[in-house]
């Protein structure tokens, strides 16, 4: 794509909202390009830090009143394409994500980014698998969010879960958020594995000590999806969610607190009734001030009043040899509450002999990808 770009008309930095892509520009500024698809994808790659425009800038024309000069340049035979920013406001450098890594995987790309989070008031890191686009006319892929468990980062599942072959085959983008804020100074946040760093529990903390940074619920359900939709060629309206352990808890409550937001849900070994287990009691007391307040983030409590019209299919796999099953995970509490509430599309599969590890997850990951692919209406391409 670079070799055909000879002119970029810029004021400062290009953003999706500031890109001229209206019908008036078709056949002029953008020539034969699909102005509503190809140009936004190009701009997204610039915003992600994957393309440096500086070597291709030949003109800088400021102000809407001077747009005619760009038309003259375009029709003067000195360039082929132009991207124009007409807004005066510039995007601060700190608001642009930083590309940390970019690796080819199963025909697509596994990318890792760092960005400033308004929700968590710190730099956050996430990874995303972007599947291969075989044809330019292919629709943007739907998105699956994978929430990891205690002690994890965005890297655990992307390297251990064996998701990419199936996700790449069906054309499914997969996003891996971190599990807590990082790089902040809070006394006691690194004292234990099940609270603080690596243990954000996907809630919005209200206790004064934690409330500034520990807004993981807002981060994974609002801020990060908005960022992903802006930065990547994905369909942000077709979204599903899954997770493991603490992340399974996060996936369940994200769905149950947002009826209609997620097309499908799945979990490996989720914490299903956290107000009734030690992990949840510790988290809710510390972040929210009481276990009672934690009912707002308890899947078993939330499912009791979930509206029947938005019952997305839920798949749960649970190993029978999981050492946390009896005292921490409590899946039967969830299924009992679901049955009483009339939440029908929930499938709990007890898997004999499997534990809590990524060996278990990788064994059944294909089933989970297929679960979401079916709900999202995508399938393997021939």
Kindly label every feature range from the protein language model:
Residues 1-28, 66-68:
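Glycine-rich cofactor phosphate-binding loops and adjacent beta1-alpha1 units
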Residues 3-7, 29-32, 57, 178-179, ...:
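Short strand-turn motif at the edge of the Rossmann-like AdoMet-binding core
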Residues 15-22, 45-50, 102-106:
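Short, conserved catalytic or adaptor-binding loops enriched in Gly and charged residues
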Residues 25, 33, 314-318:
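C-terminal transmembrane module of eukaryotic multi-pass membrane proteins
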Residues 34-90:
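C-terminal hydrophobic helical "lid"/dimerization subdomain
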Residues 92-382:
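Non-catalytic cap/lid and distal C-terminal segments of serine-dependent acyl enzymes
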């Amino acid at each position: 794509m670079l070799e055909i770009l000879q002119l970029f008309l810029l004021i400062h930095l290009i953003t999706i909202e500031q890109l001229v892509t209206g019908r008036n520009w078709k056949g002029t500024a953008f020539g034969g390009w699909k102005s509503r698809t190809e140009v936004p994808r190009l701009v997204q790659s610039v915003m992600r830090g994957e393309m440096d425009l500086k070597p291709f800038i030949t003109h800088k024309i400021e102000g809407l009143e001077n747009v005619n000069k760009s038309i003259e340049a375009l029709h003067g035979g000195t360039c082929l394409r132009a991207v124009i920013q007409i807004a005066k406001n510039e995007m601060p450098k700190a608001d642009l994500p930083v590309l940390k890594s970019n690796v080819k995987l199963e025909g697509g790309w596994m990318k890792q980014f760092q960005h400033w989070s308004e929700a968590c008031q710190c730099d956050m890191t996430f990874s995303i698998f972007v599947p291969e686009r075989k044809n330019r006319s292919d629709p943007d892929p739907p998105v699956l969010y994978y929430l990891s468990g205690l002690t994890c980062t965005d890297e655990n599942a992307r390297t251990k879960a064996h998701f990419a072959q199936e996700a790449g085959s069906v054309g499914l983008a997969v996003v891996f958020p971190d599990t807590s804020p990082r790089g902040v100074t809070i006394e006691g946040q690194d004292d234990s594995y099940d609270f603080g760093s690596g243990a954000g529990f996907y809630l919005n903390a209200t206790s004064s000590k934690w409330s500034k940074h520990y807004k993981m619920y807002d981060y994974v359900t609002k801020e990060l999806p908005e960022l992903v939709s802006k930065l990547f060629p994905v369909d942000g309206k077709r979204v599903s969610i899954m997770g493991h352990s603490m992340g399974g808890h996060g996936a369940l409550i994200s769905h149950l607190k947002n009826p209609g937001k997620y097309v499908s849900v799945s979990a490996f070994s989720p914490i299903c009734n956290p107000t009734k287990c030690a992990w949840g009691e510790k988290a809710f007391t510390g972040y929210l001030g009481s276990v009672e307040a934690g009912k707002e983030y308890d899947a078993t409590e939330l499912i009791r009043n979930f509206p029947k019209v938005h019952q997305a299919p839920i798949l749960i796999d649970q190993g029978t040899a999981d050492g946390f099953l009896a005292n921490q995970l409590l899946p039967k509490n969830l299924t009992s509450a679901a049955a009483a509430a009339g939440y029908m599309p929930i499938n709990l599969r007890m898997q004999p002999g499997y534990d809590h590890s990524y060996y278990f997850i990788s064994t059944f990951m294909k089933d989970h990808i297929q679960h979401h692919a079916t709900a999202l209406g995508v399938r393997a391409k021939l």
